[in-house]
């Protein structure tokens, strides 16, 4: 399954990329963010970050490994999380006039059995909601923060 959604921001792509890929900013926009585990890196292919999020009332660790890190253009990574199918993610940063379009993509193979029903019906909907929440939080951050000097 592939879930994809995009949103345009009125800040330069360089500013958006720098903010979004800086792990210190993740608590400001990542839905359910609890903490980033020590030793996590997120700036080059091969880096791995372990993020703890609150999902359905429980803390869960999400392990993410960067596959491609192209400044101001693209970040791709894989993720594993207990109880969910492994996933492939794309974060696209597309210049658009004075701003940029941030396009989020998640691909996963639904599991077999009852887990597959969840993956096909509820997980895709949850991913879309997380995308929308991320977009709204970033909109607030970019609207309220002065540009870096």
PLM feature segments, named:
Residues 10-14, 41-43, 67-72, 92-103, ...:
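A short, structured loop/turn motif at beta-sheet edges
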Residues 48-54, 76-82:
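Short beta-strand segments that buttress and anchor functional surface loops
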Residues 2-4, 59-63, 85-90:
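Short, surface-exposed coil-to-beta transition loops
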Residues 24, 127, 131-135, 139-146:
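Short amphipathic alpha-helical signal-transduction/dimerization elements
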Residues 16-20, 26, 49, 66, ...:
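Hydrophobic pocket/interface hotspot
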Residues 1-40, 44, 137, 148-149:
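Hydrophobic ligand-binding cavity/cleft-lining segments
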Residues 54-60, 110-114:
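Short, cysteine-centered beta-strand-loop-beta hairpins and adjacent loop/turn segments enriched
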Residues 78-133, 149:
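Beta-strand/loop substructures that line and gate deep hydrophobic ligand-binding cavities in soluble
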């Amino acid at each position: 399954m592939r879930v994809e959604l995009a949103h345009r921001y009125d800040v330069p792509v360089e500013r958006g990329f720098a903010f979004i890929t800086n792990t210190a900013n993740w608590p400001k926009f990542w839905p359910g963010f609890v903490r980033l585990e020590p030793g996590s890196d997120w700036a080059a292919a091969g880096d791995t970050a372990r993020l703890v999020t609150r999902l359905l009332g429980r803390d869960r660790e999400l392990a993410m490994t960067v596959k491609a890190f192209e400044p101001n253009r693209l970040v791709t990574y894989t993720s594993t999380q207990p109880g969910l199918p492994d996933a492939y993610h794309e974060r696209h940063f597309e210049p658009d006039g004075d701003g940029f379009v941030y396009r989020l993509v998640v691909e996963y193979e639904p599991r077999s059995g009852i887990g597959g029903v969840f993956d096909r019906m509820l997980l895709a909907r949850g991913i879309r909601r997380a995308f929308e929440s991320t977009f709204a939080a970033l909109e607030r951050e970019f609207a309220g923060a002065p540009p870096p000097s």
